[in-house]
Regions:
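Acidic, glycine-rich loop-and-beta core segments that form the ion-binding/anion-interacting portion
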Residues: 208-264
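Detector for repetitive beta-architecture
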Residues: 132, 154, 190, 197-200, ...
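Leucine-rich repeat
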Residues: 2-197, 204
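Short, low-complexity, polar/charged sequence segments that are solvent-exposed and flexible
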Residues: 152-155, 174-176, 199-202, 221-223, ...
Length: 264
C-alpha cells in the first residue's frame, strides 16, 4: 500500500513517526523509507532505548547520527542517559529549529557535572527558539548560562536541587512564560517571580516549609503552592484558582489586591 503512494505523501506519513526505535526500523525497510527520515519533526528516546545495546558505539553518537540526519527537528524528548558533550553536539545541529525540548537530566549528583565536560543546563542555551522546556532530575546550584528565551512560554522542572540565585537567573532568562511548573524542588529559601505574562504557576518546594515566595504576575489565573510559609502576591485581577499547602502547618499570605482578599 505504502509503495503505491507518491513520495510526498510517504514523507508526510512517516514524518509523524517519532519513537527512536521505530525510526531506526524504518531506515532498514527500504531506501524510499530511509529517504523520508530527514522529514521527521519529532524524536523520542525512551528510558530503555539502549538497555540492550552491546555495540562499541556510544549511545550519544547513535542519537547524534539520528538527529543530524533530520532537516528540521522541532521536538526532542530524551529520557535515556546522555552526557553534556553529547547534548552540546545534538543542539549544535538542531538547536535553531527546536520548539519543544524535554530531557531527563539525571545530574543530581554534584560531582557528575565536574567530570563530563559541558554542563547540561548551559548547553540548552543553543536552542534559542524553544517554546516549551521540560527538565527532570536537575542540579541547579549555579546560574545557568542562558541568554533570553524570548519564545519560551512553558517551563517545567521536576525533581531538582536548587539555590536561590540559580533559580532567579533561570527565570529571568524566560521573560515571556505563561506556564511555570516547579515540582519536588529542594534547597529554595526565597524566590521572587516577576513574570508579566504568567497565567499558571504550580510550585512544590521540599524542605522545612519555611520558603518565602513573592509573585508579581498581573495575569496570574491559577496559583498552586506547596512548602512556603510566607507568600506575597502582587496585584492581580485575573486570579481564579488558588491552592496553598504547607506540611509545617504555618503560612502567611499577603495579597495587594483587596478584591481577592476574601480568598484567604
Amino acid at each position: 500500500m505504502m509503495d503505491s503512494l507518491p513520495d510526498a505523501i510517504v514523507n508526510y506519513i512517516l514524518s509523524y513517526n517519532n519513537n527512536a526505535r521505530d525510526v531506526a526500523v524504518c531506515n532498514c525497510v527500504s531506501k524510499r523509507w530511509k529517504d523520508s527520515m530527514p522529514y521527521i519533526r519529532s524524536l523520542y528516546f525512551p528510558r530503555s532505548s539502549f538497555d540492550n545495546h552491546t555495540g562499541q558505539e556510544h549511545p550519544d553518537n547513535i542519537v547524534w547520527k539520528m538527529i543530524s540526519s533530520i532537516v528540521q527537528l522541532e521536538e526532542l524528548v530524551v529520557y535515556t542517559p546522555f552526557s553534556g558533550a553529547g547534548l552540546a553536539l545534538w543542539l549544535s545541529h538542531a538547536g535553531s529549529s527546536l520548539r519543544h525540548l524535554e530531557l531527563r537530566m539525571d545530574n543530581l549528583v554534584e560531582n557528575q557535572t565536574c567530570i563530563e565536560g559541558p554542563l547540561k543546563l548551559d548547553c540548552i542555551n543553543a536552542a534559542k527558539n524553544l517554546e516549551s522546556l521540560k527538565l527532570w532530575g536537575v542540579l541547579m546550584t549555579h546560574p545557568p548560562r542562558w541568554d533570553a528565551f524570548q519564545k519560551l512560554w512553558n517551563l517545567e522542572i521536576v525533581g531538582a536541587r536548587m539555590e536561590d540565585p540559580a533559580l532567579s537567573a533561570a527565570l529571568r532568562a524566560c521573560p515571556n512564560l505563561t506556564n511555570l511548573l516547579l515540582l519536588g524542588c529542594e534547597g529554595v529559601i526565597s524566590v521572587s517571580i516577576d513574570l508579566p505574562h504568567l497565567q499558571q504557576c504550580k510550585l512544590d518546594f521540599y524542605g522545612l516549609g519555611n520558603c518565602s515566595l513573592s509573585l508579581t504576575s498581573p495575569k496570574i489565573e491559577i496559583l498552586e503552592v506547596q512548602g512556603c510559609s510566607w507568600i506575597r502576591v502582587c496585584e492581580s485581577n485575573c486570579l481564579k484558582n488558588l491552592s496553598i499547602a504547607n506540611n509545617a502547618g504555618n503560612h502567611l499570605i499577603e495579597v495587594s489586591d483587596p478584591d481577592h482578599s476574601s480568598l484567604f
